[in-house]
A protein has these predicted regions:
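Predominant activation on well-ordered alpha-helical scaffold segments within soluble catalytic domains
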Residues: 15-26, 42-46, 60, 64, ...
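Catalytic cores of large soluble enzymes that bind and process phosphate-bearing ligands
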Residues: 2, 6-13, 33, 55, ...
């Protein structure tokens, strides 16, 4: 939705995926035999994949990849942990898209400024992450500050990183990892 390659068609898929994740994720996690919720999540991941396969990703995935490769942290967990932190970082570059995210997550209120909608979207993502049991700090996964330089070195050259809507450097990525620690 906010990658450099995003366009109207990919946005349509991503917004629908966000709506479906908002609707089905908690039920799928806490009621694993709920076929409707599991199907909803399967469709959501499929349409999200259709979008990002055509427009690329950004620094969330670029930073998640080394967490998995070096520390064997599941990719979904790494992405979910990093997502609100990177959303905060990227918000100034895509405020209009964050309004759409807030609407898709049903946290947009009429009259909100773009900045307020962005904050509501980030808060909603973080709250959903907490509710489904995602660790909120890399330290909970055994990552130490001494590991961060190695992670940032890998993340800055990751194939996904250049798609980020805001330019990043190794130093910025290191700071983002520190915020996640």
């Amino acid at each position: 939705l906010i990658t450099k390659g995003a366009w109207e068609m990919s946005d349509m898929f991503e917004i629908k995926a966000i709506e479906m994740i908002t609707r089905y994720l908690e039920t799928a996690v806490f009621e694993p035999t709920n076929a409707e919720a599991r199907n909803g999540m399967a469709v959501a991941q499929y349409i999200a994949g259709m979008a990002f396969s055509n427009v690329g990703l950004g620094v969330v995935h670029g930073m998640a990849h080394p967490l998995g490769a070096i520390f064997d942290i599941p990719h979904g967990v790494a992405n979910a942990l990093l997502l609100p932190i990177i959303m905060e970082f990227n918000a100034p570059a895509a405020l209009d898209k964050y309004v759409e995210i807030a609407k898709a997550m049903t946290v947009y209120k009429e009259g909100m400024s773009q900045e307020e909608a962005a904050r509501a979207a980030v808060d909603a993502v973080r709250a959903l992450s907490v509710r489904v049991g995602i660790p909120q700090h890399l330290s909970e996964l055994g990552i130490k500050e001494s590991d961060l330089d190695k992670l940032a070195t890998a993340a800055i050259v990751d194939v996904c990183t250049p798609g980020n809507p805001r330019e990043v450097t190794k130093e910025i990525i290191l700071d983002l990892y520190k915020k996640a620690l």
